[in-house]
């Protein structure tokens, strides 16, 4: 049997590969080695590992690599620690191939640790342009990878121009669209039980609500506090029920979280519920029934495009990515954000 290793590092990476995990698990000639690492192990980012286990996937290895601090320095140090720890893990598991996702620093560690041991790497969602450190990581991982599964033709062409063998480049689309397709005709059900998850206002799911996902931008990480405050102010003044997901683990996320906590303490009478995480299908069903998605998550570019959900994309985090007509780009300005939502 071929030993296929998948590394899940965070909330979004699990959503990207859940259907792939199922396919490998069911295949009679494949063995799944599942490594869970990074923020997927931490309660402050929603304990993604618990969702993974509940879905029936038992991790083969759990690898702790994150250094606390959420700064540029700790991101670099976590990458180094990730290389050390994942190198040992790959050496012990001896996979035939390692599958890595997207463009985070954990992805860089995965690609280096496997390629230096002559273990082939398959990279999902390479070849895209965003202009931040993520793009540098993404293109570096492309050069460390042997097989490339990309979202669109532009990404495929870009990888081929980088010198990769076109026979090893596959336009597979975004794998999270598999999940979006599966929930396409489903509606929000009360069994999502949002009142028991997160803190803040109890959202009534059969009344209009917004969803917010806003993360710090790596080359603007020192402005994360101000960026979040601008969006918080806009949402608060709109006085519409809102489900707000905590930011990813990136440089600046501590400041983003601090801004949210200060707002939560000072603005008692608001209609926002802050949630760490939801299982992928529940999240997509929730999103599909919302008025729109606000923030700077790639979910707005990918899943929302497929599901036809309006998106107010704030700032530069998704600059360069292909997008549908459902996306409206705005700056970090309270009035502009409010007008775009309305």
Residue ranges and their predicted role:
Residues 1-342:
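Nucleotide-activated sugar donor-binding and catalytic core shared by glycosyltransferases
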């Amino acid at each position: 049997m071929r030993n296929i290793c998948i590394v899940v590092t965070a909330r979004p990476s699990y959503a990207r590969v859940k259907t792939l995990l199922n396919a490998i698990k069911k295949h009679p000639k494949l063995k799944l080695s599942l490594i869970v690492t990074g923020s997927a192990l931490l309660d402050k980012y929603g304990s993604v590992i618990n969702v993974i286990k509940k879905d029936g996937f038992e991790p083969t290895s759990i690898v702790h690599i994150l250094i606390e601090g959420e700064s540029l320095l700790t991101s670099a140090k976590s990458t180094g620690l990730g290389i050390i720890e994942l190198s040992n893990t790959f050496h012990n598991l001896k996979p035939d191939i390692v599958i890595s996702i997207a463009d985070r620093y954990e992805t860089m560690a995965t690609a280096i640790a496997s390629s230096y041991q002559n273990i082939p790497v398959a990279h999902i969602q390479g070849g895209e342009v965003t202009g931040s450190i993520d793009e540098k990581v993404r293109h570096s991982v492309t050069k460390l990878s042997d097989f490339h599964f990309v979202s669109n033709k532009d990404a495929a062409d870009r990888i081929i121009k980088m010198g990769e063998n076109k026979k090893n480049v596959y336009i597979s689309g975004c794998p999270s669209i598999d999940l979006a397709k599966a929930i396409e005709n489903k509606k929000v059900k009360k069994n999502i039980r949002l009142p028991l998850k997160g803190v803040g206002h109890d959202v009534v799911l059969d009344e209009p609500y917004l969803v917010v996902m806003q993360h710090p931008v790596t080359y603007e990480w020192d402005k994360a506090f101000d960026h979040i405050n601008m969006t918080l102010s806009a949402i608060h003044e709109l006085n519409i029920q809102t489900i707000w997901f905590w930011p990813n683990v990136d440089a600046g996320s501590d400041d983003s979280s601090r801004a949210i906590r200060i707002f939560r303490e000072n603005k008692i009478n608001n209609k926002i519920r802050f949630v760490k995480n939801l299982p992928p299908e529940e999240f997509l069903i929730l999103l599909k029934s919302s008025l729109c998605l606000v923030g700077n998550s790639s979910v707005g570019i990918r899943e929302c495009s497929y599901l036809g959900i309006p998106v107010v994309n704030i700032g530069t985090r998704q600059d360069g990515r292909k997008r549908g007509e459902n996306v409206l780009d705005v700056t970090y300005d309270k009035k502009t954000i409010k007008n775009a939502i309305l």
